[in-house]
Amino acid sequence: MKNPEQKNSEKHDVQHISRLREVASVGLTALRYSGVEYIARQARDGKPIGPALAAFMVADVADGQILDDTPLRRVTDGVVDTAAVVRVMYELGKRYPEARAGIAAVALGQVATGAANAYHLAKTSEVTKGGRYKRAANIATAMLAIIAARGNPRRTRLAGCIAAGVVAATTVPHLRGIGKPTGKKVRRL
């Protein structure tokens, strides 16, 4: 049988290791942003962004599946994802004026989702994982970015309408149950 000092020491070691894992997870998630600048430069220079954007999205899904899903990592993931959308869409909007309406609609959806999730976090101390809804919005946004980067105004406007509709439809689930505790650290939609 272990004495109380050994138990406390082991508990402290487990907490220390858990904290180190969380810091590593947050660091790896934040590291994904480095790929965003490359994508933004490609967009600014009128070069294809599809492969780099696909790699970024695969990394996003992979880090969500592999890394610890702590509240701090979820917040970091949301910040990185939002910063990525803002950075790339900013460059696309400067280069392709026909993309601006779609970009504005997607941005409004991002703001509404972010505000809903921030409100829920403030009220309940729970972060939100958007799941399939956020994934659908991200794919629609990426589709808009890839099509806009190809420089076809008609297709860009159509892609903007589609992305706006998908983002609007996927924002609604973030509003359900907002501010009501789920009893978990991560609210999953």
Tell where the protein language model's regions lie, with residue ranges.
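Short juxtamembrane and helix-loop transition motifs at transmembrane-helix boundaries
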Residues: 11-18, 60-72, 93-98, 120-128
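Hydrophobic, membrane-inserted alpha-helices
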Residues: 33-38, 83-90, 140-147
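Helix-coil boundary and interhelical linker segments in multi-pass alpha-helical membrane proteins
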Residues: 39-51, 89-102, 150-158
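Acidic (Asp/Glu-rich) catalytic motifs at the cytosolic membrane interface
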Residues: 48-89, 110-118
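A loop-to-helix transmembrane entry motif
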Residues: 74, 98-110
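Membrane-interface loop-to-helix entry segments
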Residues: 26, 76-83, 129-140
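C-terminal membrane-associated helical module and adjoining short loops/tails
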Residues: 2, 6-10, 15-21, 108-189
